[in-house]
Design a protein with these regions (language model features):
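Formylglycine-dependent sulfatase
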Residues: 24, 29-369
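Secreted/periplasmic carbohydrate-active enzymes, especially glycoside hydrolases
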Residues: 1-2, 31
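Sec-dependent N-terminal signal peptides
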Residues: 17-25
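Bacterial N-terminal signal peptides that target proteins for export
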Residues: 4-17
Length: 369
């Protein structure tokens, strides 16, 4: 599947080339000793790597979209290097992310297909990852947003206790993640190995084979849905939306779909501000424009392309917020900002949300259709 591009914001081009040779060290998910952190007096460039979700080459105005405008992402393209012929390692989420972080072809490894929400950690903790390379070079490392690479041991995570292994076992100093995808249970955030806001008196149970608890499902109670499914996505209902998989418990920890982008941005801003005096690497996976597409009210109805267009606007806002944060902290000129997508566009991916009907001449595939 064709990926749309990488756009790199840089005021000093040599920073890009000084960074890239480090990535040439990737030879696959080898089991190698973790090296000691390299100390240096030189100020290393901060690196922010944005992995958007299911975004197409033709979804951005800097790539010719005329039905929607993405000014903040366009600004990145104008200031940096805009790739016109880049490719994703895989056409789906989990294997694409696995390859990015490990440098390994996912089809050579077991369990790298699309992960369930209760899958164990897919990346071996002995593997040297991209995060390890940054950490060894003296960076503070963070993973925020969509994860979808499994958590916990071979039998999956303990949602009610310490969740390990986690991103913090493969090179990240800090994590605040969506365990899988926003259409899969559990619909909770995990921060530094613990479910956020979990009430121990209301433990979480998750199953992908059979129903657990008595929470309604899309199949049994379609009248409770605010967004109906076109195929699948009819298991446990969370926030009026049928999900893949079953869960019960953890009511105080459940996310609100309309607020996910704001939450991710808030956590990213806090990480950047906290580490403004240190070189940092931030890996940020957005939930946009993956299903279910539930934009914040600020963006609902603001595009001419229905909810899929609305969440593209929300994604562009996300990038703008991060750019503004870098500018306000005075570190934009020393930050590499890389923006790409995990794979190409998906239009109808399980919900009746009008995405196909509201294209109005918009072509997410762009020139690759």
């Amino acid at each position: 599947m064709v990926n749309f591009k990488n756009t790199i914001r840089m005021n000093h081009p040599y920073l890009l080339w000084s960074l890239l040779p480090g990535f040439s060290l990737f030879t696959g998910c080898t089991v190698s000793p973790k090296k000691e952190v390299i100390k240096s007096d030189d100020r290393l460039p901060n690196v922010i790597y944005i992995f958007s979700d299911d975004l197409g080459f033709g979804d951005l105005s800097c790539y010719g979209a005329t039905k929607i405008q993405t000014p903040h992402i366009d600004s990145l393209a104008a200031q940096g290097a805009q790739f016109m012929n880049a490719y994703a390692s895989s056409a789906t989420s989990t294997p694409s992310r696995f390859c990015l972080l490990t440098g390994a072809y996912p089809w050579l490894y077991e369990n790298t297909e699309i992960a369930t929400g209760n899958a164990g950690m897919i990346i071996d903790t002995a593997c040297v990852t991209m995060a390890d390379l940054f950490k060894n070079a003296g960076y503070v490392t963070g993973a925020i947003g969509k994860w979808h690479l499994g958590l916990g041991g071979p039998n999956g995570p303990d949602w009610n206790g310490e969740i390990t292994p986690s991103p913090r076992n493969i090179g990240f100093d800090y994590d605040f993640v969506i365990p899988a995808t926003v259409d899969r249970v559990p619909c909770v955030y995990v921060e530094n190995d613990r479910v956020v806001n979990l009430d121990p008196k209301d433990p979480i149970f998750v199953d992908y084979n059979k129903k657990v608890g008595n929470w309604p499902t899309g199949k049994e109670n379609p009248e409770l849905l605010k967004m109906k499914s076109s195929h699948g996505h009819d298991n446990t209902i969370i926030n009026g939306i049928g999900r893949i998989g079953y869960m019960t418990g953890g009511k105080s920890a459940l996310w609100v779909d309309e607020d996910i982008a704001d939450t991710i941005v808030s956590k990213a801003k806090a990480f950047i501000a906290k580490n403004k005096e240190n070189p940092f690497f931030l890996y940020l996976g957005t939930q946009d424009v993956h299903v279910p597409r539930i934009p914040h009210p600020r963006f609902a109805g603001k595009s001419d392309l229905g909810v899929r267009g609305d969440v593209i606007l929300q994604l562009d806002w996300t990038i703008g917020q991060l750019m503004h944060t870098l500018d306000s902290l005075g570190i934009a000129n020393n930050t590499l900002f890389i923006f790409t997508s995990d794979n190409g566009p998906v239009i109808d991916d399980g919900y009746i949300d009008g995405a196909l009907e509201n294209l109005n001449g918009h072509t997410p595939m762009g020139i690759y259709r």
